[in-house]
Amino acid sequence: MKELIQSLLEQTLESLKAQGIVPADFEARIQVDRTKDKSHGDLATNLAMMLTKVAGKPPREMAQLIIDNLPASAQVAKVEIAGPGFINFFIDDNALANQLKAALGDAMLGVKAAAPQTVVVDYSSPNLAKEMHVGHLRSTIIGDSVVRALEFLGHKVIRQNHVGDWGTQFGMLLAYMEELRAQGDDKANLELSDLESFYRAAKLRFDESDEFATRARQLVVELQSGDAYCNKLWREFNDISLSHCHDVYARLGVSLTRKDVHGESAYNADLAQVVADLDAKGLLAISDGAKVVFQEEFRNKDGEPLPVIIQKADGGFLYATTDLAAMRYRSGVLNADRVLYFVDLRQALHFQQVFSLARTAGFVRDNMTLEHMGFGTMNGEDGRPFKTRSGGVVKLVDLLDEAVERAEQLVRSKNPDMDETEVKEIARVVGIASVKYADLSKNRSSDYIFSFEQMLSFEGNTAPYLLYAYTRVAGIFKKAENIDLTNAELVLDHDKEKELGNKLAQFGEILARMVDKGQPHILCGYLYELAGAFSSFYEACPVLSADSETARDSRLLLSRLTADTLKQGLSLLGIETLERM
């Protein structure tokens, strides 16, 4: 309905231009919003106030002119002027009911496909030298939910797992791997099964043994020069590390696969050319032996230009160089319209600098957007970054294990007679869903406090609450499996039916906002409100015991669309649903 009102207003604006009331060259971004108070209609616009100055008319007079020129639509029951010049639209109940009925027979649930774009999404991107930890959670699940929603809306999405698979630390790891292999493959494989311990042991050898450190540095040089033996060792290590990552992805229900891996090493051959091209454009300067770029718009607190370091004095390249090569690849080869980077907010300045430099250097097309979708920190209940009791980094797999264990205790306490297999399956779904939803339901730009107690609660905006809400709606159909709804009509007579219907009709708008802003909490908030609207409807409007078959069948249709929307919405967040809890 929002798109309909927008279209009617666009036609009206053209009519006002044709009549000379509004200048022909005037461009307006017409905004239509949902009203909070339904006594003021369903949708509202401030277009009259936008046109007041250019048309030279008072806002309310301008609003009346808009209404007088508005094309007639059977889907609009009435239009009113409110306050200083807002225009309120009341949607016809039958039109809304017909829209909802059509959504029931549609795989997209009535959501219109967007004008398709090619969207590259850079997310997760762990460092392969170490095991995935809680710091990787936000990028991985926020990026994945936005990817799912983009694909649902019809966009071509290219996932890019920009893993850290290159650098001097790999010399140390390969030297240790080589040392263990000399003692037998079994020992090497055993130690590699715990990457965190492997990394610590390698670092200890590097710090304590000059001979080992020399060998590690030698391996870095050989690896970078393309030595076949080193390359083989490096590939073996990365393969093992990626297996660890994909085990975690599988548990999280994340859609990344091996073919989405396009790590730092993929750009090695392009880095020298990036430097040469920046030099050819006169952008490079030398600072303390390093090749850097100074950009006037980026200065420190003393007003001095901040450099982007492109190549160190020893010839080594940096993240900025690799990111520039990646941007050029994503523009020229992948032909992206949008590139979204789900990376920690603390990297904001880095991305501002490299985005600006990529444009100045002509590495990306003018019509391609570069968007840093930064996120805050996941903190413990002490308000500090989440750590183990001893102050160490929490492995992501350990966090998931604890969530599932706690969920299992919860399920057992509520269902002491439940079958063991079912308990474990429900616990798995609830545990993983709770971790994901606790994160996704927060504004990604904010830090948040991680609390097992809060995330496993059945009250408030949590995964258990929504999963239970879905099972409650789906449960109605177990009792109504013999009722034929083929010819049922959907009618909205009760206020609570209309409220639920209006909420269901917003699904497409919500998804469009979510992918535009890269903010999954928008969808989470909507699903929570939808579950609340259904609860209010269910209390006020008996379904199976309705006064008539017509009312019963209509309410069953509303319930079916609610269940489908909850399930689809949770699926777009990467969350499985349950038929019973």
From Swiss-Prot:
SUPFAM superfamilies noted in UniProt: Anticodon-binding domain of a subclass of class I aminoacyl-tRNA synthetases (SSF47323), Arginyl-tRNA synthetase (ArgRS), N-terminal 'additional' domain (SSF55190), Nucleotidylyl transferase (SSF52374)
GO molecular function terms attached to this record: arginine-tRNA ligase activity; ATP binding
Instruction: Check the record and name the InterPro entries matching this protein.
Output: aa-tRNA-synth_I_CS, Arg-tRNA-ligase, Arg-tRNA-synth_N, Arg-tRNA-synth_N_sf, ArgRS_core, DALR_anticod-bd, Rossmann-like_a/b/a_fold, tRNAsynth_Ia_anticodon-bd
Its subcellular locations are: Cytoplasm
**Gene3D superfamilies xrefs:** Arginyl tRNA synthetase N-terminal domain, HUPs, Isoleucyl-tRNA Synthetase, Domain 1
Q: What is its main location?
A: cytoplasm
* Chain location of the short sequence motif 'HIGH' region per the record: 126-136
**Catalytic EC class:** ligase
Reaction it catalyzes: tRNA(Arg) + L-arginine + ATP = L-arginyl-tRNA(Arg) + AMP + diphosphate
Q: Does the keyword Disulfide bond apply?
A: no
Pfam families xrefs = Arg_tRNA_synt_N, DALR_1, tRNA-synt_1d
Key words, A-Z: Aminoacyl-tRNA synthetase, ATP-binding, Cytoplasm, Ligase, Nucleotide-binding, Protein biosynthesis
Q: Tell me its EC number(s), please.
A: 6.1.1.19
State whether keyword Membrane applies.
no
Gene Ontology cellular-component terms for this entry are: cytoplasm
One of the GO BP terms on file: arginyl-tRNA aminoacylation
Q: Which family does it belong to?
A: Belongs to the class-I aminoacyl-tRNA synthetase family.
On assembly, the entry states:
Monomer.
Q: What is this protein called?
A: Arginine--tRNA ligase
Origin species? Shewanella amazonensis (strain ATCC BAA-1098 / SB2B)
In the UniProt record, what gene is named as encoding this protein? argS
